[in-house]
Each structure stands twice: as C-alpha cells, then as structure tokens.
C-alpha cells in the first residue's frame, strides 16, 4: 500500500474527548467552543490529535510529508493552520520528535518573515503617503488663508490724494460717495471702505494728545474747563498763536469771541467777588430806575393829554354859552329894522 492509502485508512482513528460535548449552535468555521481554560480550549480546538507512526516511510512527496510530520497523522493530508494548532503541537510533541519548523509545512512557506515585513512596509508607506497628502492639503488651505489675510493693496499717489480729500470732507462716507471714489481711483469699493476704517483709526490715535482729541472730548473736557474757569495749557495757546489752528478746536480759540477769551474775562471778575456783585447790583438799580422813569413819564403824558381834553371841552362849552347869550339882542335888532322899513 502507498502512503496515500494508509492516510485514507487511518481517518477514523481521530478521537474526541467524551467529557466535552459539542454544541451545534455554537459551531464555527474555526472549531468548537468548550468550557475549559486551556489555550486550545480558548482558541476552539477540542479535538485531540493522536500520535501515529508512519508505516513504511515510502511517501517521499509533499503529501507523504504532510501525512507523517513530526510523528503525528492528519486526516486527508490537510493541515489546520492556526496558533492553537502550533501550541498543540508544541505541547503534545514527544521528546524524540524532530524539530518543528515552518518550512516543513508547504502552506506556510509563502508567508515568510521577509514577505510579512514587506507587506508591513507597504502598508506603512501607504498610510504615511495618505497622511502626507492630507497634511499637504491642510497646509495648502492654511497657506491660502494666510495669503488672503496678508493681501495688501498698494495705493498710488493719485489714489491717496483722492482718498485724503474725501476723508477731509467726511470721515464716514456713504455708499454713493464710496462708489464715486471707486470710479475715480479705479479701486474696489470694499478696499476703499477698509482704507477709511484704517484712516479713522489712525486719526483717533493721533488726536488723543492735548488739543487733538475727538469732538466729544473737546465738548466735554474743554467745556468743563471753560465752565470752571480753568486755564488752558500753554501748548494749545502757543499752537493757536503760531497758526496751528487745525490742532485745536476752532470754536475754542477762534477770533470771533472765542470761549477761551470769554472764560478769561469771567476769570478776571469772578462772580463771587464783591466788585462783581456791586457792579451787578448797580446795573440792576440803573435798570430799575430807567424803567421807573419811563413808566412815570408815560403816566404823566397820559395825564396831560386828559387835562388838555378836559380844557378843550370846557372852552367849547363856554364859547357855546357866550354865543347863546349874544344871539337874542341880535334878533331884536333885526326885528326893529324890519318894522322901520
């Protein structure tokens, strides 16, 4: 008999432990699950491989080697591949058995260590390439964002001149004014809006020093100083004398009755001094006297007109009486003259 026939005849010699029952519901492709805690039990290997000596040793091909490997016989010449199989071989191998090497198994020969390492290197390379691609994409996106943020417009002298003129006219131009500037300067409207924002920030920063504050600060600070008769700093007065009227409030140091001059005049004669009170009382007395004289003169004029009216009426009455007294004799004379005739 050949080695193949011996392997076929020896199929029913494989036995199972009677203490472990087979659960058909838990049957898997890898084996059966048991209740033990050994490595073979945890890995699902419940069959005990019985050692068997090869018969004549005539099988020189691969099938004969697989049937009589290390003193163990396998049914059908098939070799179960797995960690449990290797562990069972190591545990049940007799001391006189030859050394077990993976090269003895033809199914394990393609999966050598070098091939496994090559596969790992390929996987690592593929993973690293994906990471590099994703990192490059992220870097590209970040660089695009940075480029957009760092994009700056270079203005020409003509554009700056037009923008400065518009800024002196109005610090907050409307949409129509910005569109007109865009047509003049050939700039986009959003660039003009950003330029005005930066220009206002620069102006506010420069106007923070004395005499260059904003309008609210001028009306608040200088108004309080004028109300309380606080002298202004010499720097502002000197700048106004030197002609730097743009550096201070024009209504504060202007020629036509500036508030600073008024505050100086009030400061010379403060309202709490006796001179100022005397002058105020004297002016009030004069005003009262003038009003009294005007009222009395008006009353006297009215009385005179009434007296004149009364006198005129009395004279008219007297004249009428005299005419009545004189009229009868005249009538008698006329009657006498008529009779004589």
UniProtKB/Swiss-Prot annotation:
Stretch list, region Disordered: 127-151, 262-341
Motif (Octapeptide motif): 37-44
Cellular localisation: Nucleus
Main location: nucleus
GO CC annotations, alphabetized: nucleus
Keywords: Developmental protein, DNA-binding, Homeobox, Nucleus, Sensory transduction, Transcription, Transcription regulation, Vision
Gene Ontology molecular function: any one: DNA-binding transcription factor activity, RNA polymerase II-specific
Biological process according to GO: visual perception
UniProt feature, compositional bias: Basic and acidic residues: 277-292
Domain CVC: 208-265
Tissue occurrence: Restricted to the neural retina.
Signal peptide location: none
Transcription recorded as keyword: yes
DNA-binding residues: 148-207
Entries under InterPro entries matching the protein: CVC, HD, Homeobox_CS, Homeobox_domain, Homeodomain-like_sf
Subunit structure: Interacts with UBE2I.
Family: Belongs to the paired homeobox family.
Entry text on domains: The NLS interacts with UBE2I.
Protein name, entry field: Visual system homeobox 1
Originating organism: Carassius auratus
Organism lineage: Eukaryota, Metazoa, Chordata, Craniata, Vertebrata
This protein's encoding gene: vsx1
